[in-house]
Amino acid sequence: MTTQPEQIDLSRTHMVGIGGAGMSGIARILLARGYSVTGSDMKDSRSVLALRAAGAEVAIGHDAANVTGGAELPTVVVTSFAAIPKDNPELTAAREAGIPIVRRSDVLAELMSDRRAFLLAGTHGKTSTTSMAVVGVQAAGLDPSFAIGGQLNRAGTNAHHGTGEIFIAEADESDGSFLSYSPEVAVITNIEPDHLDYYGTEEAYVAIFDEFATKVTPGGYLVCCLDDPGAAALAARVRAAGTAPTVLGYGSRAAADQHPDIPAAAIIEEMIPDARGTAAKVRFNLPGQEERYEDIRVAIPGAHMTLNGVAAITGGALLGADLEKVIAGVADFDGVRRRFEYHGEAGGVRVYDDYAHHPTEVTAVLTAAKELVEATDAGRIIAVFQPHLYSRTMNFASEFARALSLADEVVLLDIFGAREQPVEGVDSRIIGEKLTCEWHFQPDFSAVAEQVIGIAKPGDVVLTIGAGTVTMLADEILRCGREAQGE
């Protein structure tokens, strides 16, 4: 349980698990604002090295002395309770010393408190949409602060302390902590059951988004994707309640026609996929502005990415950024690390990596891959999938199988358990048994790359998919492929 004062004293902040995607971003902003930052993590990493270079003191390993062994005690200890157990020695030391322990979301809320917050929430697509919003608002000549769950390819960072009045952030619903925020603009990309290990029921998971909608500031906007049944239903419920905030929708023409009672701020009239991504014609009808049609481009393949781009553009424009400049910025967006990230080509085989770890995300990335294959007259799609969490694998085995069956061939790795202990009788084969395409189960991680190169042919597209260590295989597959070619 957190012990949060009314106002958090961030002057000497200690962060447990400082190298994680969310924690490292907050640390970067704290350092840029002049606060003293210490922290710990289980191993060195690129983010830990970067934080040290920026002025943070980071210890490897968790030890009570990291909290109480310095000349001065920290004024606050920050953690992610989803990732760090309550009996962690640093948390125990903080409790015994009377140091407040808060969640990372509480600190992020404090950092946003003097800014106009633009938050991106939803089961899927948060990182990509947040990233596009950042590059779009930056292209409009503004300098927003931002905190993202992934690393912007071009900027090489996941966070920034800006001079402007806007703060753009990804709002993580996994443990309900996004209820700490008070956004002026909140985008909901989609809502469907996930994180049932925390919420218990689908109803509880959906209900947390209704509560999040109440956090939008007076005069603010809740912007929901009309193509997603869950997000559209939320928009309808909030409108029916007749209370703040103003509810707007975005999405395809077909979806807008299905929801005529939800004012559409942006309607995609046409989407044209090609080898460079997707071009689209969009009708914007933003409050206080004349209706206008604009051509947009999103360089990352997939209809889901086009929807994310439209969401980012709409939110930026609602905060006063110049619409045409935001559109130009999004067109120039070159992706986020581990979101349909191109790693290279070996022997005519192209290798991509993606963080997808929910059936809907897997469906989206494989659909995007099929669009890419069709646009470039390429060969087959080979998916290398590592399930994430035993509970998620059990709950969604059939859904994962349907999604992965979009590939021509699948290599299944062992489950990446993360915070969970193994469950007897549960491994990746419960997905494989339901696949309708050719598949292989490879429990030996060190043998995967060689097996994939043995399967792949020139023209094929290989996708490494999952939230765990599978990302390490993208470059290893390329290395094996080049060795096989004698390169």
From Swiss-Prot:
ATP binds at residues 122-128. This is UDP-N-acetylmuramate--L-alanine ligase. Belongs to the MurCDEF family. It comes from Corynebacterium urealyticum (strain ATCC 43042 / DSM 7109). The keyword Electron transport does not apply. Keywords: ATP-binding, Cell cycle, Cell division, Cell shape, Cell wall biogenesis/degradation, Cytoplasm, Ligase, Nucleotide-binding, Peptidoglycan synthesis. It comes from the Bacteria. Cell wall formation. Pfam families: Mur_ligase (PF01225), Mur_ligase_C (PF02875), Mur_ligase_M (PF08245). It is an enzyme of class 6 (ligase). GO terms for molecular function: ATP binding; UDP-N-acetylmuramate-L-alanine ligase activity. GO terms for biological process: cell division; cell wall organization; peptidoglycan biosynthetic process; regulation of cell shape. Gene3D superfamilies: Mur ligase, C-terminal domain (3.90.190.20), Mur-like, catalytic domain (3.40.1190.10), NAD(P)-binding Rossmann-like Domain (3.40.50.720). It is found in: Cytoplasm. Its main location: cytoplasm. Pathway: Cell wall biogenesis; peptidoglycan biosynthesis. It catalyses: UDP-N-acetyl-alpha-D-muramate + L-alanine + ATP = UDP-N-acetyl-alpha-D-muramoyl-L-alanine + ADP + phosphate + H(+). One of its GO terms (cellular component) is cytoplasm. Its EC number is 6.3.2.8.
